[in-house]
Amino acid sequence: MKRKRIDIITLGCSKNLVDSEQLMRQLEEAGYSVTHDTENPEGEIAVINTCGFIGDAKEESINMILEFAERKEEGDLKKLFVMGCLSERYLQELAIEIPQVDKFYGKFNWKELLQDLGKTYHEELYIERTLTTPKHYAYLKISEGCDRKCSYCAIPIITGRHISKSMEEILDEVRYLVSQGVKEFQVIAQELTYYGVDLYKKQMLPELIERISEIPGVEWIRLHYAYPAHFPTDLFRVMRERDNVCKYMDIALQHISDNMLKLMRRQVSKEDTYKLIEQFRKEVPGIHLRTTLMVGHPGETEEDFEELKEFVRKARFDRMGAFAYSEEEGTYAAQQYEDSIPQEVKQARLDELMDIQQGISAELSAAKIGQQMKVIIDRIEGDYYIGRTEFDSPEVDPEVLISVSREELEVGQFYQVEVTDADDFDLYAKILNKYE
């Protein structure tokens, strides 16, 4: 008997992706054939997992829903369901505006979708997922929500307060994923450093990472989305002592000006920030720091922006992203501040900041020529094998390109390489040997 096909479309962040992967596993158990983010959706049923973080993400989600609603009207789709952050925030409004959708779910009640299809949610599969990533790496979500009160951020409004997963559940999930061939774990949360405070009454991230690192088969652990205030400094020891904890930290700093940090309600100062960066580099030699910065938040003066540029020049981040402020309804900034900085000024500041970082990135990449590094091969693309070092997270960071013609390599395997060339972003390398 031919199985019914369901198309899952995931928009937004890697935390959303984990939810989609859990749903896919449940749907497969229920007897469906499931595809993810296909360019040619042909299923009888579609599920769109939406993002509602900023204006562009909301627009993308709405356009995707409308595209599938049109397919349904044309008879190419029998059922259409929507879940995720956008529908968590605007469920009633969306249901009125887009009646072609059979049902909208929030971010946390997607299990009801199975019941609405006449199927059962299998509790015993709670740690299992159908991976959409290459089989050698996976995202590991350790908590939901956020207790921070940053002025510009709608995430706490959408996802609610911080809720940690239990340590044992996380460790069970890691063991399961290792059994499926996963070697590399991107540990993610809206706010990593708060992990455990709700369950264990203290920050437990260092202990969690240490315990994950002890599981046989875990080759790389990479940490994403830390917060600078009240950073759990015992994590430095874990990163220094454990070879399979990557010397990499993704920590969103947003700004450096004390004026802006106060307006953003970041609970951290310029002095605190510089001290934390210095401590990272002293305590964890060789660490690569990724950060995210914001320009154009209400109240940002030219002096504040000059201070931010000087910070980028001094800090010399290994990886950096930046974005322009966009007003999000319901946030403190939207209620208390006037979004008075013109869009063209925001964009000009963003471009200028990224130009500075591009020069820094080019210098840091060029300095790696001649170095030997351990890489994992993600895929083959054109004339190159595409790999990453421990300092590179999938999708967002530089890659290592190795010519296909030189040697046949295995996707998902580790190799020792020598860097032979570099551009502003990526490295080029030759193979020395395979890690057994």
UniProtKB/Swiss-Prot annotation:
This is Ribosomal protein uS12 methylthiotransferase RimO. GO terms for biological process: tRNA modification. Pfam families: Radical_SAM (PF04055), TRAM_2 (PF18693), UPF0004 (PF00919). It catalyses: L-aspartate(89)-[ribosomal protein uS12]-hydrogen + (sulfur carrier)-SH + AH2 + 2 S-adenosyl-L-methionine = 3-methylsulfanyl-L-aspartate(89)-[ribosomal protein uS12]-hydrogen + (sulfur carrier)-H + 5'-deoxyadenosine + L-methionine + A + S-adenosyl-L-homocysteine + 2 H(+). Catalyzes the methylthiolation of an aspartic acid residue of ribosomal protein uS12. Residues 4-122 form the MTTase N-terminal domain. Disulfide bonds: none annotated. Residues 366-433 form the TRAM domain.
